[in-house]
Amino acid sequence: MTKEKIIVIVGPTAVGKTALGIALAGAFNGEIISGDSQQVYRHLDIGTAKASAREQALAVHHLIDIREVTESYSAFDFVQDAKRAIEDIVSRGKLPIIVGGTGLYLQSLLEGYHLGGDLDQKELLAYRQQLETLTDTELYQLLASKGIHLDQVNRRRAIRSLELNQFARDLENQEAPYNPLMIGLTDEREVIYERINKRVDLMMASGLLEEARWLFEQYPAVQASRGIGYKELFPYFQGQASLEEATATLKQQTRRFAKRQLTWFRNRMAVRFDSISESSYPQAIYDRVERFLKEP
């Protein structure tokens, strides 16, 4: 069976994924699917770095503004929604382009976890999320307790092996449903950190404080409020930190998040990274996409 070709753009926050996605959509007749766990929420526009109205006018975007802030959203929900969006985009002769930094969501979609058959997908994804909370040492101890031996151990292989052990009959014959071209964007760490600092300053100037205050006053305990960009400002509203301190914390936590994102994609998904500072960027990516689409 021929697998549908899709483009997947990943990388740390503030590296330019949205801009590249829009450019590729224009060049290759594509539509964008957000792969970000926070951009599904309505009313949370600035802190989630959601594509602006102008940017959304340049390319059709899917899975943005599809949940109220009071609703929960999971990897299971994303897989369902993304599959429907891909089917819709392909049915109209267009190219699906997934843009986002929520690694667990993308891995769940790309690695063949189908939503039909005997396997309870909610149970599978809940088990994976449980495994993701374990340290490397705890993972390897769990492997040993189940009699699983891996010659070369990394987190991705460890988690996959534990899933197979837990759901062997349902998972062992599944294949990845898509043929993805993985595109990773990166840059020197200090350059990314400077981009993050400038982005936070721009967000604050654009109304992030008011957006965060609304969330704090109306829905302080919902899942959406736990995302980076909001909870760091809550101590200011509670009188526990100055605005300067809260903003500095937001920058620091965003930088740490970007580092975790890079580590996650490098360790757990087969991603080729391109530096946005290279003279060949973005033409080299355009050429790669063109070759990929011409392949049988």
UniProtKB/Swiss-Prot annotation:
<keyword id="KW-0067">ATP-binding</keyword>
<keyword id="KW-0808">Transferase</keyword>
<dbReference type="Pfam" id="PF01715">
    <property type="entry name" value="IPPT"/>
</dbReference>
<keyword id="KW-0547">Nucleotide-binding</keyword>
<dbReference type="GO" id="GO:0006400">
    <property type="term" value="P:tRNA modification"/>
</dbReference>
<feature type="site" description="Interaction with substrate tRNA">
    <location>
        <position position="128"/>
    </location>
</feature>
<keyword id="KW-0819">tRNA processing</keyword>
<feature type="site" description="Interaction with substrate tRNA">
    <location>
        <position position="102"/>
    </location>
</feature>
<keyword id="KW-0460">Magnesium</keyword>
<feature type="region of interest" description="Interaction with substrate tRNA">
    <location>
        <begin position="36"/>
        <end position="39"/>
    </location>
</feature>
<dbReference type="InterPro" id="IPR018022">
    <property type="entry name" value="IPT"/>
</dbReference>
<dbReference type="InterPro" id="IPR039657">
    <property type="entry name" value="Dimethylallyltransferase"/>
</dbReference>
<feature type="binding site">
    <location>
        <begin position="11"/>
        <end position="18"/>
    </location>
    <ligand>
        <name>ATP</name>
    </ligand>
</feature>
<dbReference type="GO" id="GO:0052381">
    <property type="term" value="F:tRNA dimethylallyltransferase activity"/>
</dbReference>
<comment type="similarity">
    <text>Belongs to the IPP transferase family.</text>
</comment>
<dbReference type="GO" id="GO:0005524">
    <property type="term" value="F:ATP binding"/>
</dbReference>
<comment type="subunit">
    <text>Monomer.</text>
</comment>
<dbReference type="InterPro" id="IPR027417">
    <property type="entry name" value="P-loop_NTPase"/>
</dbReference>
<protein>
    <recommendedName>
        <fullName>tRNA dimethylallyltransferase</fullName>
        <ecNumber>2.5.1.75</ecNumber>
    </recommendedName>
</protein>
<feature type="binding site">
    <location>
        <begin position="13"/>
        <end position="18"/>
    </location>
    <ligand>
        <name>substrate</name>
    </ligand>
</feature>
<comment type="function">
    <text>Catalyzes the transfer of a dimethylallyl group onto the adenine at position 37 in tRNAs that read codons beginning with uridine, leading to the formation of N6-(dimethylallyl)adenosine (i(6)A).</text>
</comment>
